[in-house]
Amino acid sequence: MDIVSLWRQVENPLSYAVPFFFVLVAIEAVMLRADERREGKTGYSMIDTRTSLLMGSGALMFMLLIKIVTLFLFALVWTHLAPWHIPAGTWWSWILLFVVVDLTWYFNHRFSHRVRIGWAAHQAHHSSEHFNLGTALRQKWNPWSEAIFWLPLPFLGFEPWTIYVAFGFNLIYQFFSHTETIGRLPRPIEVIFNTPSHHRVHHGSDAEYLDKNYGGILIIWDRMFGTFQQELHTPTYRLTTPVNTHNVFKLQYREYGNIIADVKQAPRWLDRLGYIFAPPGWKPRRLREAEKQATNSTAEGKITATQ
């Protein structure tokens, strides 16, 4: 394969979409300001939106770096290891690719919520207390897990450049799911596709909304794998532990620092691995039991004091 010509073929649809994103963010902000005057509500904060735009700009650069690294790896896999090559010039191959890319997005997204080292990268996207088109641009600066979950695609025969194109369109679709200005859509759409209603649930920190609705374009994966949740009420948009900062570097890397601190104080290797690869919030059994005993003792003390 001619790597130079391959590189020239790799176009990122996001590069063309970004100017339209900015225009749509401005339009939505004006609409929500008008709602604020009528209802006393607003979906935008100037400093919050500025933070999201800074994070989105940085994410584009880091995505370019990931593309440079993975392009050559994927080209080698596709050229030397793929048992067959899927033609890129047919309509059915693109439909198949879009479905497969969306499925890999689902598993990568689920990994990013259920494995702490993955959550350390992804949590920045969930750090806003607002939910709007600007929030869609609040992207992570370390998209390493995508490269891992994409690796099977060139092995399955998809040309590397087509993977980047399909992923770009996947992200463009998801941009429009970050809004409160659109209610529920007709049921056939809600059943098949990831809609603003479904994605509002995903961004909620309410107990019933946690770790739900991972789909990118299609919501059928969540229905198939048991992670679907209907929107029941307006979600609480934030991390379960609010970050209280707009510093983009803290938002991007704070959880890595928390992991390092937990690993350093852990006495056993098993506990250290748990702090890295277990779900966010995991603690060793001895700490959970100690906290439970402390809670029970506090409750007993309150009962005694009231007698």
Set out the residue ranges of the language-model regions.
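Short, strongly hydrophobic alpha-helical membrane anchors
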Residues: 1-11
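Loop-to-helix transition at the N-terminal end of transmembrane alpha-helices
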Residues: 12, 16, 42-57
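Central hydrophobic cores of alpha-helical transmembrane segments in multi-pass inner-membrane proteins
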Residues: 20-32, 98-103
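Membrane-interface helix-loop junction between the first two transmembrane segments
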Residues: 25-50
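Membrane-embedded catalytic scaffold of the fatty acid hydroxylase/desaturase
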Residues: 57-66, 88-237
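Juxtamembrane/interfacial segments at transmembrane-helix boundaries in multi-pass membrane proteins
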Residues: 69-95
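Cytosolic-facing loops and C-terminal tails of multi-pass membrane proteins
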Residues: 234-307
